[in-house]
Amino acid sequence: MKIFVKTLSGSNFEIEVKPADKVSDVKTAIETVKGAEYPAAKQMLIHQGKVLKDETTLEENNVVENSFIVIMLSKTKASPSGASTASAPAPSATQPQTVATPQVSAPTASVPVPTSGTATAAAPATAASVQTDVYGQAASNLVAGTTLESTVQQILDMGGGSWDRDTVVRALRAAFNNPERAVEYLYSGIPAQAEIPPVAQAPATGEQAANPLAQPQQAAAPAAATGGPNANPLNLFPQGMPAADAGAGAGNLDFLRNSQQFQALRAMVQANPQILQPMLQELGKQNPQLVRLIQEHQADFLRLINEPVEGEENVMEQLEAAMPQAVTVTPEEREAIERLEGMGFDRAMVLEVFFACNKNEELAANYLLDHMHEFEDQ
């Protein structure tokens, strides 16, 4: 099959590959076509916001006929174990796992304090180690604090692009601190819907009156309330963020427990941890204020995500409650619903999941496939 390879300079070329080819084979093929200026050892290939690992195949990475992948060259030699760890040299003592490596700090046994120096959010001891490892992997491509600063510098140091610091920061913000997707945005352009203006950090105590930065945050909340309370299931608080107790810290996300939508989303993420990041992407379109808070306090968020789901058999009822009562769909959305039905699922079930996933066809398909056995038992 034919795929297109796009460079950071804006040019592109095509190569012939097979679905069973490994990413390492594709890198070798690119070096054969482009010569010494693209050595395989320094290549980093990105597809759909994901850095492709050498040992995986194109088919495993959903690379199909006429797909395009982005190629970058790192200034240091790539690790032969996989390109995901070779996106940039790690300056000073920052942790190298900032770009989606599985060796994250999630399995630690103690509850971490969400300070600015936390690299990636660590899951606390309230969940089993196996669970924390799974969710740690799902969240390992999110960076924050001083690690975020080093990631900005790493992207600037990688070469191949002419972006300035502000552009890199904008790309990271639009990608919700996912370095891999940010790099793709730098190359292909930042989608307009992904650009979220920075909002003020939630105040640590009930001193909003003394903190002028809190006022834009409060003013932004009513704007999210378009279309009624259930128009966007991923907008957990369409009528505005609930007021935190005066004694609650800024990192306290416990108020999410009272959100029926969050309970349903938590069940979906626990069933398929890999949808955590796309779920945050969709949530960010509806409630950027909440996503900012989640980004700043990822440890608290992972603690909530790890908590057992009460009444798992009622997940679909929760999803149904999160749906709008009356909705309109575009022709494109109707086609997406029909494609999901074509996979063999009941129309009512498809509609419930499709709207619960905020009309994201990929998320809906993943959820339907992961819960196929449950639907068959009903």
Curated annotation (Swiss-Prot):
For this UniProt record, the keywords arranged alphabetically read as follows: Cytoplasm, DNA damage, DNA repair, Nucleus, Repeat
> Which Gene Ontology terms cover its molecular function?
damaged DNA binding; polyubiquitin modification-dependent protein binding; proteasome binding; ubiquitin binding
User: What's this protein's name?
Assistant: Ubiquitin receptor RAD23d
The organism that produces this protein has a lineage beginning with: Eukaryota, Viridiplantae, Streptophyta, Embryophyta, Tracheophyta
**InterPro entries (UniProt xref):** Rad23 (IPR004806), STI1_HS-bd (IPR006636), UBA (IPR015940), UBA-like_sf (IPR009060), Ubiquitin-like_dom (IPR000626), Ubiquitin-like_domsf (IPR029071), XPC-bd (IPR015360), XPC-bd_sf (IPR036353)
Residues annotated as domain UBA: 146-189, 330-371
The cross-references to SMART domains, in alphabetical order and at most eight, read: STI1, UBA, UBQ
Q: Which GO terms describe its biological process?
A: nucleotide-excision repair; proteasome-mediated ubiquitin-dependent protein catabolic process; response to cold
Enumerate the subcellular locations listed in this protein's record, separating them with semicolons. Answer: Nucleus; Cytoplasm
Organism for this UniProt entry? Arabidopsis thaliana
* Gene3D superfamilies given in the database record: DNA helicase RuvA subunit, C-terminal domain, Phosphatidylinositol 3-kinase Catalytic Subunit, Chain A, domain 1, XPC-binding domain
Q: So which domain of life are we looking at?
A: Eukaryota
